[in-house]
Each structure stands twice: as structure tokens, then as C-alpha cells.
Regions:
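Gly/Ala-rich beta-loop-alpha elbow adjacent to hydrolase catalytic centers
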Residues: 54-58, 62
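Conserved alpha/beta-hydrolase catalytic His-Asp/Glu region
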Residues: 86-88, 105-161
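Catalytic histidine-centered segment of alpha/beta-hydrolase-like enzymes
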Residues: 200-213
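Catalytic histidine neighborhood in serine/cysteine hydrolases
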Residues: 179, 183-202
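Acidic beta-to-alpha connecting loop that harbors the catalytic carboxylate
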Residues: 5, 172-174, 199-201
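Flexible "cap/lid" loop of the alpha/beta hydrolase fold
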Residues: 67-108
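Short beta-strand/loop motif that positions the catalytic acidic residue
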Residues: 162, 168-170, 174
């Protein structure tokens, strides 16, 4: 599991305990300045074959892993991912400049407000958790991760014809990657299931944590059944 920018395992805190009967979840935090290098480190840590989950920038990293070693990926879960190149690199560079100038907290406020759907039932709690994760990561991690995000390659190609069970778990009010983007991904993947979570922005596992559990479990069961060639009993 590859968390979003400035996030760690707390992004999946509600889901992790509910999945241990189906998988052995491992959350890999990353802080490389280059997606290809980050992907190489993920592959070094992973088993011969694994299922892959990525949220936002972690989803871009997941696609880089998939590009590097497609035969090792048995299933894919993406949330809030734009598979193309960065939509606003100049704006992202300005954010980096502000952080270098000591304005990390101000930049965090901007990012957090855009990540979390303000009208959501758990918006305040989600914002608190997001800020806590970001402060644990700190400005240096932000600068390294954001460099990887800004310079990432277009990875739409790795999705075309992808034939592993794929979950697209999306917040309906996602301000970074629209539901239309998720539908475009689903159109390219042979075995995709799109689940749109209402009352939710960019981080469904944080904003609507309980609502995500059934979708993730259903996806993991599909992965297991594909591997076994038979339904789970």
C-alpha cells in the first residue's frame, strides 16, 4: 500500500485490521525524488507477486511499479490518481518555493483544504489526521515527494488492456482527480470495478473509512479467486 503525498499508514488505519484474513498488508512510505527510483525500492521490498494499492501520488508510484514489473502485480487498487503528467507543474514549483521559504504550514493548509471535502461528515477529523501525518513527514519529505510527482511520466499506457482485478475507489467530490478520470481508467482496464464514495473528496479511506471496507474486501476476494481459479468458500 502506497500512501498519498505526506501520508503514512494512518491513511489506511480503519481498513488494515479488516483485511488480515485476506492479505498481509504492508504500507510502504516513500520519499524519493524520482518515481522510477521509488518504484525500484518498492520492488526490492515486495515478494515475487503481490497486489498493489496506491492513493493519489502513491497511485502514480503504483503505476510506475506496474510499468517496471507488470508480471509481479496480481491486483491493483487506485484512489484519486491522474495517470498523466502533472497538470500544473508551475503551480507545484511555487508550492516548493514556499516550503523552502519556511511556509510549510501555509502550504499544508492549502493542500489539506483541497484534499478533504469540506461538507463531509468527518471533514474536521479527517483534516486533523491529515495534518498530523503531514507534520510527521515534514517539509523535506514534501520537497522530495513533490519533485517525483512533478517529474512523473505519463502512465496511461500501462493501464491499456491491464488484465488483473482492479479497484478504482474514488471520492465523488475529488478536487484533484475527477470521477471522469476514474471512468477513463476503467474504460482501459479489462477487469475494473469503479466504486464512487459519496460525501467524500480526495482521500476516501480517511474521509469515509468504513464505506471503503466492503469495496476493498470484494476486490481482494476477486484477486484470490483469480489466483485460485475458483470461488472462495
Amino acid at each position: 500500500m502506497l500512501p498519498a503525498l505526506l501520508c503514512d499508514s494512518e491513511l489506511y488505519a480503519t481498513q488494515l485490521p479488516t483485511l488480515t484474513d485476506l492479505a498481509d498488508p504492508l504500507v510502504v512510505t516513500w520519499a524519493e525524488r524520482d518515481m522510477a527510483r521509488a518504484a525500484a525500492l518498492v520492488l526490492e521490498r515486495g515478494p515475487a507477486r503481490f497486489v498493489l494499492a496506491g492513493t493519489s501520488a502513491g497511485g502514480n508510484l503504483a503505476l510506475e511499479v506496474l510499468a517496471a514489473a507488470p508480471a509481479r502485480v496480481a491486483g491493483l487498487w487506485l484512489t484519486g490518481v491522474n495517470p498523466g503528467r502533472h497538470a500544473d507543474p508551475d503551480g507545484a514549483r511555487l508550492m516548493q518555493q514556499r516550503v523552502r521559504a519556511g511556509e510549510f504550514e501555509a502550504v499544508l493548509d492549502v493542500l489539506a483544504a483541497r484534499c478533504v471535502h469540506a461538507a463531509g461528515a468527518r471533514a474536521d477529523e479527517a483534516l486533523g489526521v491529515l495534518r498530523a501525518m503531514a507534520r510527521r513527514a515534514g517539509p523535506d519529505v514534501f520537497l522530495r515527494q513533490s519533485e517525483a510527482v512533478i517529474t512523473r511520466r505519463d502512465r496511461w499506457d500501462v493501464l491499456t488492456g491491464l488484465d488483473v482485478p482492479t479497484l478504482l475507489l474514488w471520492g465523488r467530490e475529488d478536487a484533484f482527480a475527477s470521477v471522469e478520470t476514474a471512468r477513463a481508467i476503467a474504460d482501459r482496464v479489462r477487469d475494473a470495478r469503479l466504486v464512487v464514495v459519496d460525501d467524500c473528496g480526495h482521500l476516501p479511506t480517511l474521509e469515509r473509512p468504513e464505506a471503503c471496507v466492503p469495496a476493498v474486501r470484494t476486490w481482494l476476494i476477486a484477486v484470490a479467486e483469480r489466483a485460485l481459479g475458483a470461488p472462495l468458500r
